Protein backbone atom coordinates (compact mmCIF):
# COMPACT_ATOMS: atom_id res chain seq x y z
CA UNK A 1 0.00 0.00 0.00
CA UNK A 2 1.45 3.34 -1.06
CA UNK A 3 1.16 6.00 1.61
CA UNK A 4 1.15 9.68 0.79
CA UNK A 5 4.08 11.46 2.43
CA UNK A 6 2.99 14.19 4.82
CA UNK A 7 4.16 17.68 3.93
CA UNK A 8 6.92 18.99 6.23
CA UNK A 9 5.84 21.19 9.10
CA UNK A 10 6.36 24.93 9.12
CA UNK A 11 6.52 27.21 12.15
CA UNK A 12 5.22 30.74 12.54
CA UNK A 13 6.52 32.29 15.74
CA UNK A 14 4.74 35.41 17.01
CA UNK A 15 6.97 37.12 19.57
CA UNK A 16 4.53 39.08 21.73
CA UNK A 17 6.99 40.71 24.07
CA UNK A 18 6.24 40.52 27.81
CA UNK A 19 2.51 39.80 27.43
CA UNK A 20 1.49 38.95 30.98
CA UNK A 21 -0.45 35.74 31.66
CA UNK A 22 -2.52 37.58 34.28
CA UNK A 23 -4.18 39.73 31.62
CA UNK A 24 -4.31 36.97 29.02
CA UNK A 25 -6.23 34.65 31.33
CA UNK A 26 -8.48 37.45 32.53
CA UNK A 27 -9.49 38.64 29.07
CA UNK A 28 -9.95 35.09 27.77
CA UNK A 29 -12.24 34.34 30.73
CA UNK A 30 -14.23 37.46 29.89
CA UNK A 31 -14.71 36.23 26.31
CA UNK A 32 -12.71 39.06 24.78
CA UNK A 33 -9.94 37.02 23.13
CA UNK A 34 -11.51 34.25 21.02
CA UNK A 35 -8.35 33.50 19.03
CA UNK A 36 -6.21 33.18 22.16
CA UNK A 37 -8.97 31.07 23.71
CA UNK A 38 -8.82 28.73 20.74
CA UNK A 39 -5.05 28.39 21.09
CA UNK A 40 -5.35 27.60 24.79
CA UNK A 41 -8.11 25.05 24.16
CA UNK A 42 -6.74 23.31 21.07
CA UNK A 43 -3.02 23.83 21.60
CA UNK A 44 -0.48 23.60 24.40
CA UNK A 45 0.51 26.14 27.03
CA UNK A 46 4.14 25.92 28.13
CA UNK A 47 5.78 27.94 30.87
CA UNK A 48 9.56 27.86 31.10
CA UNK A 49 11.99 29.05 33.76
CA UNK A 50 15.46 30.56 33.64
CA UNK A 51 18.02 28.33 35.41
CA UNK A 52 19.41 30.06 38.47
CA UNK A 53 17.00 32.99 38.44
CA UNK A 54 15.97 34.05 41.93
CA UNK A 55 13.12 36.61 41.97
CA UNK A 56 13.78 37.36 45.64
CA UNK A 57 17.18 38.87 44.95
CA UNK A 58 17.52 42.69 44.94
CA UNK A 59 16.92 44.09 41.47
CA UNK A 60 16.32 40.59 40.12
CA UNK A 61 14.54 42.10 37.12
CA UNK A 62 17.90 43.23 35.78
CA UNK A 63 18.80 39.69 34.76
CA UNK A 64 15.57 38.98 32.90
CA UNK A 65 15.22 41.95 30.54
CA UNK A 66 13.95 41.18 27.01
CA UNK A 67 17.45 41.70 25.57
CA UNK A 68 18.67 38.91 27.84
CA UNK A 69 15.79 36.45 27.66
CA UNK A 70 14.93 36.52 23.95
CA UNK A 71 18.48 35.52 22.90
CA UNK A 72 18.27 32.61 25.35
CA UNK A 73 14.97 31.58 23.83
CA UNK A 74 16.36 31.81 20.28
CA UNK A 75 19.53 29.87 21.03
CA UNK A 76 19.04 27.68 24.10
CA UNK A 77 22.04 29.40 25.69
CA UNK A 78 21.79 30.64 29.25
CA UNK A 79 22.21 34.39 29.84
CA UNK A 80 25.68 33.72 31.25
CA UNK A 81 26.64 31.82 28.10
CA UNK A 82 25.55 34.41 25.53
CA UNK A 83 26.48 37.46 27.62
CA UNK A 84 23.95 39.84 26.05
CA UNK A 85 22.27 42.38 28.30
CA UNK A 86 21.10 45.26 26.10
CA UNK A 87 20.70 46.64 22.60
CA UNK A 88 23.75 48.04 20.85
CA UNK A 89 25.97 45.15 21.96
CA UNK A 90 28.05 43.01 19.66
CA UNK A 91 25.80 40.00 19.02
CA UNK A 92 28.48 37.74 17.56
CA UNK A 93 28.08 35.37 20.53
CA UNK A 94 24.76 34.18 19.12
CA UNK A 95 25.55 34.27 15.39
CA UNK A 96 25.01 30.82 13.98
CA UNK A 97 23.25 29.75 17.18
CA UNK A 98 19.79 31.31 16.71
CA UNK A 99 17.10 28.92 15.53
CA UNK A 100 16.85 30.74 12.20
CA UNK A 101 20.65 30.56 11.72
CA UNK A 102 20.63 26.81 12.27
CA UNK A 103 17.70 26.23 9.93
CA UNK A 104 19.20 28.55 7.32
CA UNK A 105 22.50 26.67 7.45
CA UNK A 106 20.61 23.44 6.73
CA UNK A 107 18.84 24.91 3.72
CA UNK A 108 15.46 25.41 5.39
CA UNK A 109 13.84 28.70 4.41
CA UNK A 110 13.46 31.32 7.14
CA UNK A 111 12.07 34.82 7.55
CA UNK A 112 12.92 37.15 10.44
CA UNK A 113 11.09 40.38 11.23
CA UNK A 114 11.95 42.39 14.33
CA UNK A 115 13.41 39.65 16.52
CA UNK A 116 15.44 41.24 19.33
CA UNK A 117 19.24 41.27 19.04
CA UNK A 118 18.96 39.81 15.52
CA UNK A 119 21.17 42.49 13.95
CA UNK A 120 23.03 42.25 11.64
CA UNK A 121 20.98 40.55 8.90
CA UNK A 122 22.66 37.40 7.66
CA UNK A 123 22.05 34.26 5.65
CA UNK A 124 23.69 31.08 4.47
CA UNK A 125 21.42 31.18 1.45
CA UNK A 126 18.00 30.07 2.69
CA UNK A 127 16.76 33.26 4.39
CA UNK A 128 13.94 34.76 2.34
CA UNK A 129 13.77 37.99 4.32
CA UNK A 130 15.63 39.35 7.30
CA UNK A 131 14.59 42.59 9.02
CA UNK A 132 16.27 43.09 12.43
CA UNK A 133 14.82 44.94 15.42
CA UNK A 134 14.02 48.66 15.26
CA UNK A 135 16.86 49.35 17.73
CA UNK A 136 19.38 47.99 15.22
CA UNK A 137 22.61 49.86 14.53
CA UNK A 138 21.43 50.78 11.04
CA UNK A 139 18.55 49.91 8.68
CA UNK A 140 20.36 47.07 6.90
CA UNK A 141 17.95 44.30 5.89
CA UNK A 142 16.79 42.28 2.91
CA UNK A 143 15.11 42.05 0.46
CA UNK A 144 15.27 45.62 -0.88
CA UNK A 145 11.52 46.17 -0.57
CA UNK A 146 11.74 45.72 3.20
CA UNK A 147 14.25 48.54 3.65
CA UNK A 148 11.66 51.33 3.58
CA UNK A 149 9.97 49.91 6.69
CA UNK A 150 13.27 49.43 8.50
CA UNK A 151 14.45 52.95 7.67
CA UNK A 152 11.29 54.38 9.20
CA UNK A 153 11.42 52.13 12.28
CA UNK A 154 15.10 52.81 13.00
CA UNK A 155 14.53 56.54 12.46
CA UNK A 156 11.60 56.44 14.88
CA UNK A 157 13.62 54.59 17.51
CA UNK A 158 16.51 57.02 17.19
CA UNK A 159 14.24 60.06 17.53
CA UNK A 160 11.71 58.72 20.04
CA UNK A 161 12.26 61.51 22.56
CA UNK A 162 12.70 64.32 20.05
CA UNK A 163 9.99 66.87 19.31
CA UNK A 164 8.13 65.59 16.23
CA UNK A 165 8.10 69.02 14.57
CA UNK A 166 11.89 69.02 14.31
CA UNK A 167 11.89 65.99 11.99
CA UNK A 168 8.34 65.99 10.64
CA UNK A 169 9.25 66.29 6.97
CA UNK A 170 11.80 63.47 7.07
CA UNK A 171 9.50 61.29 9.16
CA UNK A 172 6.57 61.74 6.78
CA UNK A 173 8.76 61.01 3.76
CA UNK A 174 10.03 57.79 5.33
CA UNK A 175 6.52 56.83 6.42
CA UNK A 176 5.14 57.28 2.90
CA UNK A 177 7.87 55.04 1.51
CA UNK A 178 6.77 52.16 3.75
CA UNK A 179 4.18 51.37 1.06
CA UNK A 180 7.04 49.59 -0.71
CA UNK A 181 7.30 47.27 2.29
CA UNK A 182 3.61 46.44 2.35
CA UNK A 183 2.21 49.12 4.64
CA UNK A 184 -1.39 49.80 3.72
CA UNK A 185 -2.56 53.31 2.92
CA UNK A 186 -5.04 53.08 5.79
CA UNK A 187 -2.19 52.31 8.21
CA UNK A 188 -0.08 55.16 6.87
CA UNK A 189 -3.04 57.53 7.17
CA UNK A 190 -3.69 56.33 10.71
CA UNK A 191 -0.08 57.01 11.62
CA UNK A 192 -0.05 60.45 10.01
CA UNK A 193 -3.26 61.39 11.82
CA UNK A 194 -1.99 60.44 15.28
CA UNK A 195 -0.61 63.81 16.38
CA UNK A 196 -3.50 65.88 14.94
CA UNK A 197 -5.98 63.56 16.66
CA UNK A 198 -4.14 64.00 19.94
CA UNK A 199 -4.56 67.75 19.57
CA UNK A 200 -8.29 67.30 19.01
CA UNK A 201 -9.12 64.46 21.40
CA UNK A 202 -6.56 65.11 24.11
CA UNK A 203 -4.47 62.75 26.20
CA UNK A 204 -6.86 59.81 25.77
CA UNK A 205 -5.46 59.24 22.26
CA UNK A 206 -1.78 59.43 23.21
CA UNK A 207 -1.38 55.69 24.09
CA UNK A 208 -2.08 54.68 20.50
CA UNK A 209 1.36 55.99 19.60
CA UNK A 210 2.71 52.72 20.98
CA UNK A 211 0.43 50.76 18.64
CA UNK A 212 1.57 52.44 15.42
CA UNK A 213 4.81 50.49 15.18
CA UNK A 214 2.92 47.21 15.46
CA UNK A 215 0.38 48.33 12.84
CA UNK A 216 3.17 48.98 10.32
CA UNK A 217 5.20 45.89 11.19
CA UNK A 218 2.16 43.66 10.87
CA UNK A 219 1.34 45.02 7.43
CA UNK A 220 4.90 44.32 6.31
CA UNK A 221 4.86 40.88 7.90
CA UNK A 222 1.69 39.86 6.07
CA UNK A 223 3.24 40.99 2.81
CA UNK A 224 6.64 39.35 3.29
CA UNK A 225 5.24 36.14 4.72
CA UNK A 226 2.60 35.91 2.02
CA UNK A 227 5.17 36.35 -0.74
CA UNK A 228 7.90 34.05 0.57
CA UNK A 229 6.17 31.49 2.82
CA UNK A 230 9.33 30.50 4.72
CA UNK A 231 9.32 27.26 6.69
CA UNK A 232 10.24 29.23 9.81
CA UNK A 233 9.02 32.80 10.30
CA UNK A 234 9.20 35.12 13.28
CA UNK A 235 7.66 38.53 13.94
CA UNK A 236 8.28 40.62 17.06
CA UNK A 237 5.69 43.02 18.53
CA UNK A 238 6.07 45.22 21.61
CA UNK A 239 2.76 47.08 22.00
CA UNK A 240 1.38 44.92 24.83
CA UNK A 241 4.57 45.31 26.86
CA UNK A 242 4.39 49.08 26.54
CA UNK A 243 0.77 49.26 27.64
CA UNK A 244 1.40 47.06 30.67
CA UNK A 245 4.39 49.11 31.78
CA UNK A 246 2.60 52.39 31.30
CA UNK A 247 -1.03 51.75 32.20
CA UNK A 248 -1.26 48.89 34.70
CA UNK A 249 -2.19 51.29 37.49
CA UNK A 250 -4.91 52.75 35.28
CA UNK A 251 -6.23 49.26 34.46
CA UNK A 252 -6.24 47.90 38.03
CA UNK A 253 -6.04 50.84 40.46
CA UNK A 254 -7.10 48.61 43.36
CA UNK A 255 -3.67 46.93 43.27
CA UNK A 256 -1.83 50.18 43.97
CA UNK A 257 -1.55 52.50 46.94
CA UNK A 258 -3.85 55.50 47.27
CA UNK A 259 -0.95 57.90 47.43
CA UNK A 260 1.14 60.12 45.18
CA UNK A 261 4.65 59.20 44.12
CA UNK A 262 7.33 61.86 43.84
CA UNK A 263 6.63 62.07 40.12
CA UNK A 264 2.84 62.16 40.65
CA UNK A 265 3.28 65.17 42.90
CA UNK A 266 4.64 67.17 40.00
CA UNK A 267 1.34 66.88 38.16
CA UNK A 268 -1.43 66.24 40.70
CA UNK A 269 -2.56 67.92 43.89
CA UNK A 270 -4.44 64.90 45.22
CA UNK A 271 -4.90 61.17 44.62
CA UNK A 272 -8.40 61.74 43.24
CA UNK A 273 -6.95 64.09 40.62
CA UNK A 274 -4.52 61.39 39.52
CA UNK A 275 -7.23 58.74 39.39
CA UNK A 276 -9.50 60.93 37.27
CA UNK A 277 -6.66 61.51 34.85
CA UNK A 278 -5.68 57.82 34.64
CA UNK A 279 -9.26 56.65 34.18
CA UNK A 280 -9.09 57.65 30.52
CA UNK A 281 -6.35 55.06 29.98
CA UNK A 282 -7.94 52.15 31.86
CA UNK A 283 -8.69 50.00 28.79
CA UNK A 284 -5.51 50.34 26.76
CA UNK A 285 -3.99 47.08 27.97
CA UNK A 286 -7.18 45.33 26.94
CA UNK A 287 -7.16 47.12 23.58
CA UNK A 288 -3.61 45.96 22.92
CA UNK A 289 -4.52 42.33 23.62
CA UNK A 290 -7.68 42.52 21.54
CA UNK A 291 -5.82 43.96 18.57
CA UNK A 292 -3.37 41.06 18.79
CA UNK A 293 -6.22 38.59 19.07
CA UNK A 294 -7.66 39.89 15.81
CA UNK A 295 -4.27 39.45 14.14
CA UNK A 296 -4.07 35.85 15.36
CA UNK A 297 -7.47 35.21 13.83
CA UNK A 298 -6.05 36.49 10.53
CA UNK A 299 -3.13 34.09 10.85
CA UNK A 300 -5.40 31.10 11.31
CA UNK A 301 -6.84 31.84 7.86
CA UNK A 302 -3.45 32.66 6.35
CA UNK A 303 -1.54 29.50 7.29
CA UNK A 304 -2.10 25.95 6.04
CA UNK A 305 -2.71 22.78 8.05
CA UNK A 306 1.00 21.99 8.16
CA UNK A 307 1.93 25.21 9.94
CA UNK A 308 2.32 25.43 13.71
CA UNK A 309 1.53 28.87 15.13
CA UNK A 310 3.41 29.68 18.34
CA UNK A 311 2.94 32.76 20.50
CA UNK A 312 5.83 33.42 22.85
CA UNK A 313 6.26 36.22 25.38
CA UNK A 314 9.86 35.62 26.56
CA UNK A 315 8.95 36.79 30.04
CA UNK A 316 6.03 38.12 32.02
CA UNK A 317 5.80 41.26 34.11
CA UNK A 318 4.35 42.24 37.44
CA UNK A 319 3.01 45.57 38.67
CA UNK A 320 5.44 47.87 40.46
CA UNK A 321 3.86 50.60 42.54
CA UNK A 322 5.60 53.90 41.77
CA UNK A 323 4.76 55.12 45.27
CA UNK A 324 7.15 52.73 47.02
CA UNK A 325 8.62 50.19 44.59
CA UNK A 326 10.15 52.34 41.85
CA UNK A 327 13.13 54.56 42.57
CA UNK A 328 12.70 57.31 40.00
CA UNK A 329 14.63 60.36 41.19
CA UNK A 330 12.98 63.67 40.39
CA UNK A 331 15.41 66.35 39.28
CA UNK A 332 14.14 69.76 40.27
CA UNK A 333 15.32 72.99 38.70
CA UNK A 334 16.23 75.65 41.25
CA UNK A 335 15.62 79.36 40.53
CA UNK A 336 13.79 78.53 37.33
CA UNK A 337 12.35 82.03 37.07
CA UNK A 338 15.79 83.57 36.85
CA UNK A 339 16.86 81.05 34.21
CA UNK A 340 13.83 81.60 31.97
CA UNK A 341 14.11 85.38 32.36
CA UNK A 342 17.73 85.23 31.21
CA UNK A 343 16.59 83.18 28.21
CA UNK A 344 13.90 85.80 27.51
CA UNK A 345 11.19 83.23 28.25
CA UNK A 346 9.54 84.84 31.28
CA UNK A 347 6.19 83.07 30.81
CA UNK A 348 7.69 79.57 30.99
CA UNK A 349 7.57 77.35 34.07
CA UNK A 350 8.66 73.82 34.95
CA UNK A 351 5.71 71.49 35.45
Which sequence ranges carry the predicted segments?
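Membrane-interface soluble catalytic domains
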Residues: 1-8, 22, 85-91, 96-97, ...
Amino acid sequence: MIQQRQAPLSVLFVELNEAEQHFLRRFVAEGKLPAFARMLEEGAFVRTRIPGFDPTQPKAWRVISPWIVWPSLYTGLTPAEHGLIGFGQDTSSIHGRCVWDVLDAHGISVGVLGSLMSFPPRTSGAARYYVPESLADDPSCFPDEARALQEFCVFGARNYSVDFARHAREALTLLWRTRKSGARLSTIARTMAQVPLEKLAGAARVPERAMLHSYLVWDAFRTLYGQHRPRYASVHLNHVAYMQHRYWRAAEPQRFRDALSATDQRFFQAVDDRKRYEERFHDWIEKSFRWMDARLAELFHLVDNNTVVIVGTALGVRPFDPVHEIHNPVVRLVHEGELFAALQLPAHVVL
